[in-house]
Design a protein with these regions (language model features):
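Structural preference for alpha-helix termini/caps and helix-kink/transition segments
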Residues: 2-30, 389-743
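Alpha-helical recognition segments enriched in aromatics with Gly/Pro capping
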Residues: 2-73, 87-88, 195, 199-207, ...
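N-terminal, positively charged nucleic-acid-binding surface of large information/translation enzymes
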Residues: 3, 8, 49-54, 58-206, ...
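Short glycine/proline-rich turn/loop motifs
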Residues: 68, 176-183, 300-308, 486-489, ...
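Short, well-structured beta-strand/strand-turn elements
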Residues: 100-103, 235-242, 615-620
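Short, glycine/charge-rich beta-strand/loop segments that flank catalytic centers
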Residues: 105-113, 133, 213-225, 243-252
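Long, charged, glycine-rich C-terminal linkers/tails
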Residues: 214-215, 367-372, 621-626
């Protein structure tokens, strides 16, 4: 049982036969899918049952899937990366491996209290900065605003008024100091949201995450959300209060066809978590009939954006936004709904209740899937804890592929912890990334070996008329290993898309291929079988999003032309041709100058270590000729940087060891200079004794007490050893002097 299965307490019936009104029922498929689950249907961890259940789409092979997208008020962090990479992997597997026809919907929450508050904060800070820059603005205009911001109070009306007064004073003094004098929260919040939405989508592109089939923005859905809420009111499951609208949980709960808290009933006790879902600018709880009622429409207060509605100007609550947008695309029956486990309550719980109230149905979503938490050193990411790692920051340390491997090595539904590696206050990496980097290197080296072996046979395409293809025992063993890997991968895919299990099976196949290549003479390799293994590994990695679906062997991600004409060919070949010409010119110049072998070898090393890596080529020197390997230039640069860092550390260690050895030698020589008769009268012995015999051996301690016989015997041994070292020193000094005299 995985960690994700253990973390769900069992709250309700697990199947349709366990209770008169089950919390979840297996989906009733349409005629196109009446035969039940496909033989190869995966079993998904369903948050309704907290168990793995067979996946059965409602409409044959078509899958309607909605996931909660970002609330765009800040930069995306590693927690977002894990969530969206995991859903990208699951989506790719469902589409490319299981061959479902997936309609994938993601929303963008661009109306939210956090965005509104951040927009006001940025405006206020910009005005204070402008006032400070131009100078001469009265303190009576800046001090109240600074005090309000410092207090942490969420009085946006006062904040807006104070900021506007300061803006007017700045404009009166310098009209050019402010570029947007007519700023209003109605437009300002959306400008902020658009900025972070664009950044988020670029982050997703950089991470190799496929775009959704439909993107729904809250700001484009306000009219439909109002209509959606009205239907819920008309059905008797919501009520208006002081211009806001609330969902009536007790009425919904008492209806025979409905159940509230299907996902996590225990979470109802967490009032703080429920209130957090209402937003930072929520109205007084006294407006609600019951404590568990939640807001569908918020009456806007001064300083807050607003849209028209039958209940007065306001804006949608967080939960209703997803219900309305998902329903608009997928309707009253959704195959899969998903998001991070932190959205389980109250967001997804309320989303279900609203939608089932709107359609007056028992079950709106058939499978709820949640990705596991990602923590930093066991703590939730927070700027106040200084453990907030953005996607952009992570991509400066690792490639997108390496980060994806990190997540693939952990089950998507399990919690995950990252341990930062720090130099001072700066995070330079994560301990868990070491396994991901090693995994990537394992696959890269595997593809290099396969393609190198095929090139060595003169049949890079896997076939040559001159190559023998008859199988021997080694080929039969490798064939069995390929079959075993296929079975292992398939079993892992069926088991809740168990990506660690998939990687494990692929690594076992790599081990079998490496064993085959080591056992068979290079000229006797059977290329078709070897190519089959390479293509299978490539295909599965493509399903996981770490390889390109080019039809070839390898991870891909190698730039170059598209083969579409002379221009693209020239553009692709230009860097390599430039390198060849430069190298030829350098070698010719060295030859004409009569350069020695070392200079020519340095030029060759420069091409290997600098020129070729910039083209994405790694050159391995070996007996019988060098072997070239194609790689991502950025990965080669990082590999070179790691090697340089390791070399520098090794050299620094050698330097320290050399200094330490020199220090010890100097100390030893200094001690050897001391005559044995003077040994116990100086240094560490200086204050230990008061009387000595004729040979300088101590006879009495510093208090005048005569030393014991055993103690004197021990000191005599020390003095004898010193005499040997001193005699060596004198002999060496005499020899050195004799050498100088001879010269």
């Amino acid at each position: 049982m995985s960690a994700s299965e253990k973390m769900f307490p069992q709250y309700g019936p697990l199947c349709g036969c366990c209770a008169p009104v089950p919390w979840w029922s297996p989906p009733e498929a349409t005629e196109a899918a009446k035969d039940g689950p496909r033989r190869d249907a995966p079993r998904l961890l369903n948050s309704f049952t907290k168990t793995k259940v067979p996946f059965v789409p409602l409409d044959g092979n078509r899958v309607g899937w909605y996931i909660c997208g970002p609330t765009v008020y800040d930069s995306a962090h590693m927690g977002h990366a894990r969530n969206y990479v995991n859903f990208d992997v699951i989506r790719r597997v469902m589409t490319d491996y299981f061959r479902y026809d997936v309609r994938f919907i993601m929303n963008v929450t661009d109306i939210d209290d956090k965005i509104v508050m951040r927009a006001h904060l940025r405006r206020s800070e910009a005005m204070l900065a402008a006032a400070d820059h131009i100078g001469g603005i009265e303190t009576s205009l800046t001090a109240p605003l600074k005090a309000l911001l410092a207090s942490g109070e969420k009085n946006l009306g006062d904040q807006e008024a104070l900021t506007a007064q300061l803006c007017a004073a700045i404009l009166a003094r310098d009209p050019s100091a402010i570029t947007d004098p007519d700023w209003s929260v109605q437009d300002g919040y959306l400008t902020l949201a658009h900025t972070f939405e664009a950044e988020f989508m670029e982050d997703m592109r950089l991470m190799g995450i496929a775009r959704p089939d439909a993107l729904t923005r809250v700001s484009e859905y306000t009219d439909k959300i109002v209509q959606y809420i009205q239907t819920i009111i008309d059905r008797g499951y919501a009520y208006e209060s002081n211009g806001s609208v609330y969902f009536d949980v007790p009425t919904f709960e008492s209806a025979p066809n409905h159940k509230y808290a299907k996902l996590n009933k225990e979470a109802l006790k967490n009032v703080e978590l429920a209130m957090d879902g209402e937003g930072a600018l929520a109205a007084d709880a006294s407006e609600k009939k019951a404590e568990n009622d939640f807001v569908l429409w918020k009456a806007s207060k001064p300083g807050e954006p607003r849209w028209p509605s039958p209940w007065g100007e306001g804006r949608p609550g967080w939960h209703i936004e997803c219900s309305a947008m998902c329903s608009d695309i997928l309707g009253e029956a959704v195959d899969i709904n998903g998001g991070g486990i932190d959205l389980n309550f109250p967001h997804h719980e309320n989303q279900l209740a609203q939608s089932e109230a709107h359609y007056d149905i028992k079950q709106w979503v058939n499978y709820f899937v949640h990705t596991g938490h990602l923590h930093i050193d066991g703590l939730k990411m927070s700027k106040s804890l200084k453990n907030f790692i953005t996607i952009r920051a992570a991509l400066k340390m690792y490639t997108a592929r390496q980060i994806r491997f990190l997540f693939l090595l952990h089950q998507w539904s399990d919690p995950m912890d990252l341990t930062p590696v720090q130099e001072g206050d700066a995070v330079t990496g994560f301990q868990q990334m070491e396994a991901a980097v090693i995994a990537e290197k394992t696959f890269v080296e595997f593809f290099h070996s396969v393609k190198g072996a095929l090139r060595g046979l003169g049949c890079a395409a896997g076939y040559s008329v001159h190559q023998e293809h008859t199988w021997n025992d080694e080929e039969r063993v490798l064939s069995a290993s390929i079959d075993s890997a296929r079975a292992g991968v398939h079993a892992a895919m069926l088991d809740n898309i168990n990506t660690p299990g998939v990687i494990k099976s692929l690594k076992e196949l790599i081990g079998a291929v490496n064993k085959y290549l080591g056992a068979v003479d290079a000229a006797a390799i059977r290329p078709l079988l070897l190519e089959s293994a390479g293509r299978f590994v490539t295909m599965i990695l493509a399903c996981l999003g770490v390889a390109e679906t080019t039809g070839g062997i390898g991870l891909g991600d190698i730039g170059g032309g598209d083969g579409g004409g002379d221009a693209s060919k020239e553009e692709a070949m230009a860097p390599a041709l430039d390198l060849i010409v430069k190298f030829r010119d350098e070698i010719r110049a060295l030859a004409r100058a009569g350069a020695d072998t070392k200079a020519i070898m340095r030029a060759c090393d420069e091409v290997r270590d600098v020129g070729l890596p910039e083209l994405g080529v790694k050159l391995d020197d070996r007996e019988g000729g060098a072997l070239w390997k194609l790689s991502n230039p950025e990965e080669l640069r990082r590999e070179a940087a790691r090697e340089a860092e390791a070399k520098a550390k090794k050299e620094e260690q050698k330097r320290r060891e050399k200094e330490e050895a020199a220090r010890k030698a100097a100390e030893k020589e200094a001690l050897a200079r001391v005559p044995p008769g003077e040994l116990f009268k100086q240094g560490e012995y200086a204050d230990l004794y008061s009387e000595y015999d004729d040979d300088g051996l101590p006879t009495h301690d510093k208090a005048g007490e005569e030393l014991a016989k055993a103690q004197r015997k021990k000191l005599a041994k020390t003095q004898a050893a010193q005499k040997k070292e001193h005699d060596k020193f004198l002999a060496k000094a005499a020899a050195d002097q004799l050498g100088k005299t001879t010269i």
